[in-house]
């Protein structure tokens, strides 16, 4: 997963890639208990969840604020928070179980 994401997003630092690895591991683990995503293969997650979430980031000004409505498993909000620490992004979802997962992810990643 790390190699694929690094190839797709060469601007990510080693520390950020490590955060994405942790996020991926938690996503796969929690997905066994609750339906967070249909995609769990490393290359698919790297491309279709992580890299796709970061596509518009070059157009977003420094210090911007956003809200990820219906974030689900955290896409695109968590990848944005990892890749752009200058951006404040609020994650919003209607299901408490998803928010519990996201709280655990954010705590583990220090975001």
Which residue stretches match the model-derived regions?
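Conserved SAM-binding motif I beta-strand of class I
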Residues: 88-93
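Class I SAM-dependent transferase core
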Residues: 1-63, 97-100, 104-109
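Alpha-helix termini
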Residues: 48, 66, 83-87
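Conserved SAM-binding loop of SAM-dependent methyltransferases across substrates and taxa
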Residues: 73-86
């Amino acid at each position: 997963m790390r190699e694929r994401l690094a190839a797709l997003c060469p601007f990510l630092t080693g520390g950020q890639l490590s955060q994405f690895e942790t996020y991926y591991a938690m996503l796969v683990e929690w997905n066994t208990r609750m339906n967070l995503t249909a995609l769990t293969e490393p290359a698919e997650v790297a491309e279709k969840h992580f890299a796709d979430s970061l596509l518009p980031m070059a157009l977003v000004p420094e210090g911007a604020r956003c809200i990820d409505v219906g974030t689900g498993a955290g896409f695109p909000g968590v990848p944005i928070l990892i890749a752009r620490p200058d951006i404040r992004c609020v994650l919003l979802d209607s299901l408490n179980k998803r928010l519990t997962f996201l709280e655990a992810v954010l705590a583990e990643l220090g975001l």
